[in-house]
């Protein structure tokens, strides 16, 4: 899903994306600001249920604008169910977004409040589609859990991920990353908001049902600095740290945000 014609600086950043990806100005773009007083409590929403098998964890990759932890997704060993979904969604990957300072690195905001970072756990609709590639552009193709991260205490549950970053310092590097259950990164409460949105970077497909956890998790300033120490360049060229990779909030354009609580 990555391509070299976009990034996060002035010349190729979010303000420019619509030139190459007109859907950037679409009606269902993400992220959004969640206005808690306008979110509608929906009693039909079921509790979120995640069942992730640590054996499906596969590898960690520097993709140039971020890093991804990828999972084996050829069967339903690791799935998301419940919430607004009637189908089960298969775990594919997780990644983080961060900013150049601790004040603002999240993508979603809540009542205008910005967070330091944001975790995205990505799933695809394996009940209806045969692969992520097929699902990624479909309206009901993807389900992403978003977890806001607040600067404060170090989060020991991030340590295994952070310890792997040294092996993927530059763009294109990959390393095995095994025996990991990403549900350990979720907050203790799985109360959530949900809305219909998009991928938050090109190709910006409007194919994501978002599950944004109400409760945040912690991350320390030092841990955030480790994210920013990753490089967007290939090995052997001038080092360019990945300082930020968060898209600003987009207009709701009449969409409803529903709350499970």
Curated annotation (Swiss-Prot):
<dbReference type="GO" id="GO:0005737">
    <property type="term" value="C:cytoplasm"/>
</dbReference>
<feature type="binding site">
    <location>
        <begin position="200"/>
        <end position="201"/>
    </location>
    <ligand>
        <name>substrate</name>
    </ligand>
</feature>
<keyword id="KW-0479">Metal-binding</keyword>
<feature type="domain" description="Alpha-carbonic anhydrase">
    <location>
        <begin position="4"/>
        <end position="261"/>
    </location>
</feature>
<dbReference type="InterPro" id="IPR023561">
    <property type="entry name" value="Carbonic_anhydrase_a-class"/>
</dbReference>
<dbReference type="InterPro" id="IPR018338">
    <property type="entry name" value="Carbonic_anhydrase_a-class_CS"/>
</dbReference>
<feature type="binding site">
    <location>
        <position position="120"/>
    </location>
    <ligand>
        <name>Zn(2+)</name>
    </ligand>
</feature>
<dbReference type="InterPro" id="IPR001148">
    <property type="entry name" value="CA_dom"/>
</dbReference>
<feature type="modified residue" description="N-acetylalanine">
    <location>
        <position position="2"/>
    </location>
</feature>
<feature type="region of interest" description="Disordered">
    <location>
        <begin position="238"/>
        <end position="261"/>
    </location>
</feature>
<comment type="similarity">
    <text>Belongs to the alpha-carbonic anhydrase family.</text>
</comment>
<keyword id="KW-0862">Zinc</keyword>
<keyword id="KW-0007">Acetylation</keyword>
<protein>
    <recommendedName>
        <fullName>Carbonic anhydrase 1</fullName>
        <ecNumber>4.2.1.1</ecNumber>
        <ecNumber>4.2.1.69</ecNumber>
    </recommendedName>
</protein>
<feature type="binding site">
    <location>
        <position position="200"/>
    </location>
    <ligand>
        <name>substrate</name>
    </ligand>
</feature>
<keyword id="KW-0963">Cytoplasm</keyword>
<feature type="active site" description="Proton donor/acceptor">
    <location>
        <position position="65"/>
    </location>
</feature>
<keyword id="KW-0456">Lyase</keyword>
<dbReference type="GO" id="GO:0004089">
    <property type="term" value="F:carbonate dehydratase activity"/>
</dbReference>
<comment type="function">
    <text>Catalyzes the reversible hydration of carbon dioxide. Can hydrate cyanamide to urea.</text>
</comment>
<feature type="binding site">
    <location>
        <position position="95"/>
    </location>
    <ligand>
        <name>Zn(2+)</name>
    </ligand>
</feature>
<dbReference type="GO" id="GO:0008270">
    <property type="term" value="F:zinc ion binding"/>
</dbReference>
<dbReference type="InterPro" id="IPR036398">
    <property type="entry name" value="CA_dom_sf"/>
</dbReference>
<dbReference type="GO" id="GO:0018820">
    <property type="term" value="F:cyanamide hydratase activity"/>
</dbReference>
<feature type="binding site">
    <location>
        <position position="97"/>
    </location>
    <ligand>
        <name>Zn(2+)</name>
    </ligand>
</feature>
<dbReference type="Pfam" id="PF00194">
    <property type="entry name" value="Carb_anhydrase"/>
</dbReference>
């Amino acid at each position: 899903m990555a391509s070299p014609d976009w990034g996060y600086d002035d010349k190729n950043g979010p303000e420019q994306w619509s030139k190459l990806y007109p859907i950037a100005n679409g009606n269902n773009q993400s992220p959004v600001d969640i206005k808690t007083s306008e979110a509608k409590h929906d009693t039909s929403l079921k509790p979120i249920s995640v069942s992730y098998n640590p054996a499906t964890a596969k590898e960690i990759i520097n993709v140039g604008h971020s890093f991804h932890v990828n999972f084996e997704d050829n069967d339903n060993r690791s799935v998301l169910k419940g919430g607004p979904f009637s189908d089960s969604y298969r775990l594919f990957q997780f990644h983080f977004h961060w900013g150049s300072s601790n004040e603002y690195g999240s993508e979603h905001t809540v009542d205008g409040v910005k967070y330091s970072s944001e975790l995205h756990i990505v799933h695809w609709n394996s009940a209806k589609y045969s692969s992520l590639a097929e699902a990624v552009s479909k309206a009901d193709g993807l389900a992403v859990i978003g977890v806001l991260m607040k600067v404060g205490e170090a989060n020991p549950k991030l340590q295994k991920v952070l310890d792997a970053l040294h092996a993927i310092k530059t763009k294109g590097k990959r390393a095995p990353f095994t025996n990991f259950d990403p549900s350990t990164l979720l907050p203790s409460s799985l109360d959530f908001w949900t809305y219909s949105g998009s991928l938050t970077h090109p190709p910006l497909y409007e194919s994501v049902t978002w599950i944004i956890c109400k409760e945040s998790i912690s991350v320390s300033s030092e841990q955030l600095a480790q994210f920013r120490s990753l490089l967007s360049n290939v090995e052997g060229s001038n080092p360019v740290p990945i300082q930020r990779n968060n898209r600003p909030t987009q207009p709701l354009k009449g969409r409803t945000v529903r709350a499970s609580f």
